[in-house]
Structure formats: C-alpha cells, structure tokens
C-alpha cells in the first residue's frame, strides 16, 4: 500500500504516521497458534508439542502443514483412532495432545528427516478459507489475520490524511505464545494510548449464549473487562477516556458498537498497558465464532465497520484530548 515500515529484532512490523497530540499505538498480532515437532518415531509418525491454546477436543483428524521451507512444506493429518476399533468408553473421551501423532504418509524416520522435518519444526493447521453466504469467511487463523486486514485498511486511509494524532500501526508477534511480543515495541514507542485489535467471542450459538451478547454481523465490539483466570493473573479494564471515545465515535458514525465482558480471554494489551507510567488502553475487535479451532468464522461487514470506527475515533484525538480520569467520572 506504499507505506514505509520497519521491523524490530523480535519480528514486530510497525509503520509510523506523524501527527500532533497523544501518541497512539494501534496494533494486532499476526502470529498464529499451532504446534512444534517434539519427536519423530522410528516408524515416521510425528509427536507434537502444543504452541498456544489449541483445543484438544478438536484436533483428531485435522489436516496440518509442517513448515520446513518455502515450497517444501509437508502435509499431514493428526491421526484419529479407527472407529471400528474404538471402545464404547473411548468414544466419549478426548485424547490428550501428547498422545496424538501426525501421519505424513512417510514410512520411517529417515524419510521424515529427508523431507526436511526436524525436532523444533513448526506445525500449523492446513491453511484454508471458504466464503459462507455472501459476507462471511470461515477458515484458519481468522484470529488474527482478520485484524491484520482491518489495520491494513486503516493504514491505507492514514497515508492520505492531513491531520490527527501520531499513530504507530503495528503487526506483532508472539501473542499466541506468551502475549509479550508487543511489549518491547511498546517500550520503544512509549505510547500515550494503546488500542489493540483481536477477536471478540461471539455468543450467538447455543453453546455460547450464556456468555454474553456479542452477535456475528452485529458490528464491532469493545471489551469492558477481560481476565484470564487460568494461571495468568492478568487482564484489561479499559481507560474511561477510551470507552468514551469509542462510544462517541460510534454514535457519530451511526455504527453499532457491541460490548464484551469475559473471563478466559487475554490479549497482549494486558502487558502493553503497564509500560512507562501506564498507557490509556482498550481492546477493540470483531465477533468471531469457534476460536482457536481449525475453522474460525467472522463477518466481513463487522470488519468494515471496525475499520470505519477506528478511523473515526482517531479523528477525534487532538492535541487537547484528555487522558485525565477525573474528566470522565
């Protein structure tokens, strides 16, 4: 899109758009969850270690891609025990990932190694995407390639603007691994405001309806509360200036803005918010179904509206924009 960018030693990619007022870091992660090759058996079957929060109950019989180099990646399938040999008890059990293995069709360890597969090789869900109806996309790594698509459209618009705050648009790494890839970049940029883009758990399916009111196709979402609660005592409660900003921008642009409050959800913003003397922060995003599975689902209209909302909000941040909490009580 003709925008100058740079990368840091971790692999974060950032583009700076100069301006006046509070400095804004607008970011989303570009990495994806997956696996690492842990062991190659004598018979050529491959054992995996988990990289990120992969759902074990959705792994058996999934197509995967073992990443060994451009044009040389090896396809495989996570094996599923033959149904005819499955006991009545096993039919209702989830096999732990450590007991699963990948079958590449290669017949021995020597053939696997000759294909370039080594311990430590990355393994991902086999990339795929399909249009459902006219306006929905189902595929791998919608989390957070959809967020990347939104930021590309925002960057395309910022390239031609004539006013507004200084904005650093960043595509970050290591979010699915340890949530800290964005941290060194934030320490370098020292933003006043941080806006993070990621999925919002859609709650419009029977298994999720008790979790909230986030509807696919209902517009972008704003998180009012997130807390991991699974060993990582971290989360984000947004700065009141950010809540006020996005509510005003949504009203002005007639964009429906959905609200989320979830336990079990965590983003890298939870660490970015603690940089320096503290950063005024908010998690924004798009509704998505079936998170961390091989097929995630989002609505294109939500992505378009999210890009429009971000641009509208940035347009309201001027040199006198207040981050004083007393102004929002």
Q: What residue ranges belong to the model's regions?
A:
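N-terminal hydrophobic/helix-forming segments and targeting peptides
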Residues: 1-329
């Amino acid at each position: 899109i003709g925008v100058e960018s740079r990368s840091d030693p971790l692999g974060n990619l950032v583009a700076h758009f100069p301006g006046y007022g509070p400095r804004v870091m607008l970011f989303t992660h570009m990495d994806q969850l997956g696996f690492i090759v842990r062991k190659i058996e004598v018979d050529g079957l491959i054992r995996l270690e988990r990289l990120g929060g992969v759902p074990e109950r959705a792994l058996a019989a999934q197509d995967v891609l073992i990443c060994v180099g451009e044009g040389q990646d090896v396809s495989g399938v996570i094996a599923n025990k033959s149904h005819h040999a499955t006991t009545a008890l096993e039919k209702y059990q989830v096999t732990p990932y450590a007991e699963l293995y990948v079958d590449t069709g290669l017949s021995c360890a020597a053939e696997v190694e000759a294909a370039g597969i080594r311990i430590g090789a990355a393994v991902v869900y086999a990339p795929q995407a399909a249009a459902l109806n006219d306006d929905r996309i189902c595929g791998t790594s919608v989390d957070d390639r959809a967020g990347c698509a939104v930021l590309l459209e925002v960057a395309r618009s910022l390239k031609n603007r004539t006013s507004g705050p200084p904005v650093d648009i960043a595509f970050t790494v290591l979010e699915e691994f340890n949530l800290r890839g964005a941290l060194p970049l934030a320490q370098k940029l020292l933003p006043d405001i941080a806006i993070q883009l990621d999925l919002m758990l859609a709650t419009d399916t029977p298994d999720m309806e008790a979790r909230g009111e986030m509807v696919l196709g209902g517009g972008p979402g704003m998180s009012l509360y997130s807390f991991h609660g699974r060993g990582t005592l971290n989360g984000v409660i947004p700065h009141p200036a950010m809540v006020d900003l996005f509510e005003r921008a949504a009203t002005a642009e007639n964009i429906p803005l959905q609200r989320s409050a979830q336990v079990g959800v965590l983003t890298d913003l939870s660490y970015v918010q603690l940089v320096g003397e503290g950063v005024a922060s908010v998690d924004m995003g798009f509704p998505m179904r079936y998170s961390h599975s091989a097929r995630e689902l989002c609505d294109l209209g939500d992505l378009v509206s999210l890009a429009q909302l971000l641009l509208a909000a940035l347009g309201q941040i001027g040199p006198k924009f207040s981050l004083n909490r007393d102004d929002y009580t």
